[in-house]
Structures are given as structure tokens and as C-alpha cells.
A protein has these predicted regions:
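Phosphate- and other anionic-substrate recognition elements at nucleic-acid/protein interfaces
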Residues: 1-162
Length: 162
């Protein structure tokens, strides 16, 4: 069984749950350079050579954390739907960030090697393309919503507003 760390990352903080051997650890860190350094020190204190860090691809808050630790460890960024399906299969409904981090660590620990794809830090050009693609998707979604509101408008004055 692999040694795993699950991270639940938000804008300001991230929760970490580590499963090393038979021991479990959990902690919360600020999502900034100081927090990354504190978390890095905590990982080093575990004395584990072969550590796998897993997190969900939610928003863009995970990117800096993933890229930083991919330099030193095996880092996996997982589709949130996979974690959700994993939770359903284990009849778990998490309510807190700490529980989410533990669930992600459990997934990382039990997933088949073929289900985990190592994080490779994107180039600046790839980041730019990702941002443009996300912006395009957002604009497309907003246009569709605007068309739906216009179509649903009951009177002529309301239709003019859209």
C-alpha cells in the first residue's frame, strides 16, 4: 500500500491528510508560500522516501501547490468526479475539508497505478492556452445564459433589457 497525502485546497488554506504506513496525520496550512514551506517541513519530518500527493482539480487554487511539490514528490491531480464516485462507492458523505483531504488520501492510497497520472508542470505557453480556453468556455456559458433569459422574457420591455 502506497504512502499517500490527500489535499483539499481552497483559496486561503489547504487541509492535508497523510497516511504513512499505519499512521495517519492531518493538519491545515495557509495557501501561501509560508504554508507551502510549513507543509514541506511536515512532509520531511515524516521521513518517507516514497510519498504520493493527491489533490482535486478544482478552480486554479491547486496549481501552485501541485507544481511546487511535483519537484520533489509524485503529485497527482484528480478529476473531482472520480473522488465523488469513490466516496459514493465507500458510502461516504464528507462534510468538512479535513474529511475531504482524508478521502482524497484514501483514494490515492487505493487507486490503481493506471488511474493516477503524474502532474507535469505546464509550460508558460500551456498555462496561457489553458487560461484562454477557460475564458472562452466562461464567455460561451454566459452567452447561452443571456440567450435563455432573452428567450424567457415575457414582454417586449423585458426582452429589450437582454
Amino acid at each position: 500500500m502506497r504512502n499517500a497525502v490527500g489535499l483539499d485546497i481552497s483559496k486561503l488554506t489547504f487541509d492535508a491528510s497523510a497516511m504513512v504506513g499505519n499512521a495517519e496525520y492531518s493538519a491545515k496550512f495557509d495557501n501561501d508560500s509560508k504554508g507551502l514551506n510549513q507543509f514541506s517541513d511536515r512532509l520531511k519530518s515524516l521521513g518517507c522516501q516514497n510519498l504520493h500527493i493527491c489533490m482535486e482539480a478544482t478552480g486554479n487554487y491547486y496549481e501552485e501547490v501541485a507544481d511546487y511539490f511535483a519537484q520533489y514528490y509524485s503529485v497527482y491531480v484528480v478529476n473531482p468526479l472520480k473522488i465523488s464516485k469513490y466516496a459514493e462507492s465507500r458510502f461516504k458523505r464528507t462534510k468538512t475539508d479535513k474529511q475531504d483531504a482524508k478521502l482524497i488520501a484514501q483514494y490515492c492510497r487505493s487507486a490503481k497505478e493506471s488511474e493516477l497520472v503524474k502532474r507535469q508542470k505546464p509550460t508558460d505557453e500551456q498555462y496561457r492556452l489553458l487560461r484562454m480556453t477557460a475564458a472562452y468556455a466562461q464567455i460561451k456559458s454566459e452567452c447561452a445564459a443571456m440567450k435563455n433569459r432573452h428567450h424567457a422574457a415575457k414582454d417586449e420591455e423585458a426582452a429589450k433589457a437582454y
